[in-house]
C-alpha cells in the first residue's frame, strides 16, 4: 500500500504542475487535467487512510502528517482557484511549499517511510 500511496501523490504533484501551467497558458483542456487531479486527490487520501489504519500504534506524528497531507491538497486548490480568478497565487504557492516540505519530512522520518533521517 505504501507504493500505491507514493505513486499517487507523485502523480498528483505532476498533474498539479501541469494544471497550473495549462491554466496560465489558457489551454482549453486545463479543466480535464484538473478533474483528473481531483481524482488523484481522492486516491491519495484513500491510500493514506488505509496506511494510517494499518498502523498498530498511531502516534501524534502520524496524525500531524495526515493533516499536513490534507494541507498540501488544500494549498493546491488555493493555487488553482486563485489562478482561475486572476488573483495572486503567492500565498497558495507559499503554503504549498511549506506543507509539502513538512509532509515529506514527516513521511521520511516516520517508520513507514524510507530511512533517510
Swiss-Prot record:
Principal location class = membrane
Q: Where does the sequence pass through the membrane?
A: 1-21, 39-59, 61-81, 97-117
Positions the record marks as coiled coil are: none
What keywords sit in the KW lines?
A: Cell membrane, Membrane, Transmembrane, Transmembrane helix
What GO cellular component term, any one, is given? plasma membrane
What topology does it adopt in the membrane? Multi-pass membrane protein
Record flagged with keyword Cell membrane = yes
The source's domain of life comes to Bacteria
Q: Which InterPro entries match?
A: UPF0344
Q: Where in the cell is it found?
A: Cell membrane
Q: Into which family does the record put it?
A: Belongs to the UPF0344 family.
Enumerate the NCBIfam families for this protein.
PRK13673.1-3
This protein's name? UPF0344 protein GTNG_0604
Species in which this protein is naturally found: Geobacillus thermodenitrificans (strain NG80-2)
Amino acid at each position: 500500500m505504501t507504493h500505491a500511496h507514493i505513486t499517487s501523490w507523485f502523480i498528483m504533484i505532476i498533474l498539479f504542475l501541469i494544471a497550473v501551467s495549462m491554466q496560465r497558458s489558457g489551454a482549453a483542456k486545463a479543466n480535464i487535467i484538473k478533474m483528473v487531479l481531483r481524482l488523484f486527490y481522492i486516491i491519495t487520501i484513500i491510500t493514506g487512510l488505509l496506511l494510517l489504519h494499518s498502523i498498530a500504534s498511531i502516534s501524534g506524528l502520524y496524525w500531524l502528517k495526515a493533516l499536513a497531507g490534507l494541507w498540501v491538497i488544500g494549498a493546491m486548490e488555493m493555487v488553482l482557484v486563485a489562478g482561475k480568478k486572476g488573483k495572486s497565487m503567492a500565498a497558495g504557492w507559499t503554503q504549498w511549499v511549506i506543507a509539502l516540505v513538512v509532509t515529506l519530512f514527516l513521511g521520511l522520518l516516520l517508520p513507514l517511510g524510507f530511512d533517510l533521517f
